[in-house]
Amino acid sequence: MTTRLSGTTSLRPIRFGFLVRPSDKKSVSRIMRWSTCLWGGRCNPIIPVGRYPAHWRSSEPFLRKPDREVARDYMRFFEPDIIVEAEPGLAESIGFDAVSNSSLESQLISLDELHSKKWTGHRMDLYVGQSVVDIYQADYEARHQFVLREDVPALLFKEDRLAPLVEAIFGAFPRDEDADYFKKFYENAYSPKLAAAGPDTWLSVFEGKAKPPFYPTFLDLEIEPKTRREATFFIFDHTKTSDLIDYWNTRLFETPVFPVPLCWLDELKGFVSKAINSNHRPIPNNSFGTMFTSQVVFARSVKEEVAKAVVEVFSSDCPDGSFFIGRSTHPKHTDDWHGPRCARHSVKSDEARLSLEVEGGSVSFPMPYPKFAERFGGGRYRWANVVNLSAHGPSDMALCYPSNIEDRTFPHLAMGQQGPIVSREGWVLLEHYHESSGYLRIDSGTDAICRWLKKKGIEAKPSSAGRIASQMVEKLASLRAADLIADKDTIQILNKMAMQERTSNSKSTSNTKTFEGRTADTGRWHELIKKRAKNTLRFRVSLEQFTSRGILKLGLGLNCPHCTHSNWYGLDGVDYIVTCERCLKEFSYPQGSKEPRWKYRVTGPFSVPNFAEGAYAVTLTLATFAKSLSPVGDIGMTMTTGLNLKCDAFEREIDFAFWYRKERMLDQKGEPHFVVGEAKSFAEEAIEKGDLEALQVVAKELPGTVLVVSVLKEKFSEKEKRLLEKLVRWGWVSVEGRMRAPVIMLTGVELFADWTVEKSWQQKGAPYPADADRSVFSDLELFALETQRIHLGIDYYDELRKRRRT
């Protein structure tokens, strides 16, 4: 069967992450100047590494982190493609030295290497990144070649004591040796007016009456903000390097941001007040009369008394509630629980939709490129394509991976290319010439997770039970048809057929017992399907679906006249003369008798006894996460069934594992959770101490792993609850600001859910919540806490409050 994938590939500039010490004024200046020479250069973050100034540290004790961890937060938030160090060792100091792997040398470079002499040709060029020189040429040819003067003039700024303001706000060219050609090309293309930095020039730029040097870096870019604010006015001291870094980065997650230097405040306060008043208007179609508001953000170096004085100046001309006041913050992505969170802007230039066939375990596709760029440039990588692929419904293909920003040696999926870089944005491929094609290997979920565990020092191989469950998942179209078995009675009859249960032969005086031969009368199945049709709201089952999936096979039942064994013959095995399966004697088919009966026989993994060695519970648990938590199909999930795990610390078996990510609409994706679990059937004491110890040792080796314990029965026994509570409380312990191991508990209530887990809870009644918050079903940690409250009657937040009181 051909497997098809759909998705997109989006063109954008390479995202550089410039690592620099907050006190290194000279390097910050160079970074800002080189950003004026890069396509999308002002979309690149400046990541402070090293000792932070005191005013950058949070006044809230619970938000305080070591400077190194804050720098790592910057990296996780911005997810740079290329890391540029202002001095050697900065990446290593924050744990990103793996990016310096020799096979990845171009993804970690020094600031001096950015403009390299390695490349020979008709002129110098950037070692990495798309140069603005191509933009100048294309822009000139498209707009200026036959026009003596542009309506909106370009500017070029004088070099003076206000150079830091020019670099941060307007753009300036590098002072580096052999880099003066950028300025010359700019002058030739735009004939700019020489200007001095000042309030008047600021007004002309932000009122759209002049274009500064950074303007061409945005050619053909669409920048989509993820925050919904009308305006942000960033007030800072340009003599403080930390303030310049704060302003530079704030632009990348707030919009629009107007920089207001304290030295120009008196001249610009009229513009600010007018803009705040203009923004303060009713939100359309809002019945509550809510108004748009602006925000005034102060850099953290600005003293409190200065900030109060500035607010008084604005307040005198602005109505109450027209703006609110804040302080600049270190950015943290939305997966971080602690403190304010934000989302960086989406940047792209072009996008192509993909519809692909997986052939030989791989896909290929054309990728967009910037039309203004020369076909072959000097740099090794000039732009990026971000690929997002999805299957139609649940799939056994590995399309969801954890980010590899720190160590890019896994996964290696780009055939003949380096990468991809896996981020919350997608799979990032770095390109350097026109009309190139992308080639990606598509692994199975089992292969992907086993390779990832090997990188973590854990050998993983499919277990015997895991192979059975894998076959079941495959038969059910990678969980898309899991609803067929999401019924207690259906599983019970399938298991009874698989067990070959002995039944009494009431017609025999000797009371002999015979094997049923893994069969059941068709009438019994028709009754079951009729019953399910009355009780279900979503999935209409039919016997045709069971036979087409290879679960059941139709045939005829016939007793042997020699040994009375109950035989079953498939439609291709019926003849005038048939052979008994037991005694191997032939006998004539009874053509005139009523004895032959139509029967179904269970086949494949469904014919394995003992509830298919737990495969039903595993399959339905995976289906619950893939479908029933979020029925609209916005889940990213890469899964595997049972594995045998072995490392120096332990040797254990787990029933399933998967990466799970709730996709976000119009947003970067979240970081996927790694989930492992144990799945049991209907036994009264199904969960044993050893099962939970297996999960615990995995979580010790991989902190943050989500643990799942599921059973097909509706309730855990009291003994099981005591064991589970110990595991839950162990998992509550904080490691690096997060729970060590959130524990999710599922029963038949969730696994047999007719529509969604939420609906099933509502129908079941107490202790299940009737109105659980929607966030419970989109965040695995919150979902874990809710299942703990339901099944164990313990509440994580109540426990925290008790600890604080004591």
Regions found by a protein language model. Name each.
Residues 1-243, 248-806:
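Intrinsically disordered, low-complexity Ser/Thr/Pro/Gly-rich regulatory segments
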